[in-house]
Amino acid sequence: GREGLYNYPGTTKDFEDNSERFIFFARGALEVIEKLKVHPDVIHCNDWQTGLVPVYLKTAYASKEGFRNTKVIQTVHNLVYQGHFGQSDMNLTGLDRSLFNWKHLEFYRKLNFLKGGIVFSDAISTVSKTYAEEIQTAECGEGLEGVLKERSKDLWGILNGIDYTIWNPETDKCIIANYGMKKLGGKQLCKKSLQRTYKLPERDVPIIGMITRLAEQKGLD
């Protein structure tokens, strides 16, 4: 198989067949669910790569037994990435050509997968309440602010989170020493252990851990 998932490794150049790949993926996902005779209550889609799932679910699969009561939610992690493709790729979807219009799948004469997901989903979520508000503005809406404003009553911002009953430094059995708000000594022991493990040369410096892209958007500047 090829290296890379969405684009050529070491570049920002997308694979030329991305539209075909993710059309196949979206339809294939629903086909598998149908063949397994699973009757899902909710299908959760993420970003443009699954944007056509809500479209298929509400059109080609709407009358199928296993999907009649299924709801679908589309999560937008980063509105910059929308899955724009040429008009001719509409033919690959197998969807009715009439859906290629400004209300549904068309976006400045291109096919827009994420727009389809937003329009056809029952609910839309994104990574925070603030971002949910921002993407309804011209400054951050990436051209889809009108569509998102129209769906504002179905748009929710949900923060990423953790289970504090498991990831709790006061009780966690996987760290060198436990600590909490009233007992911070264990935190220093954990820091020293981390520095020894990874051979970090500077001892008297702050250590910050972040799971994120190295991008200005994340506030790293």
PLM regions with names:
Residues 1-221:
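Catalytic cores of nucleotide-sugar-dependent glycosyltransferases that transfer UDP/GDP/TDP-activated
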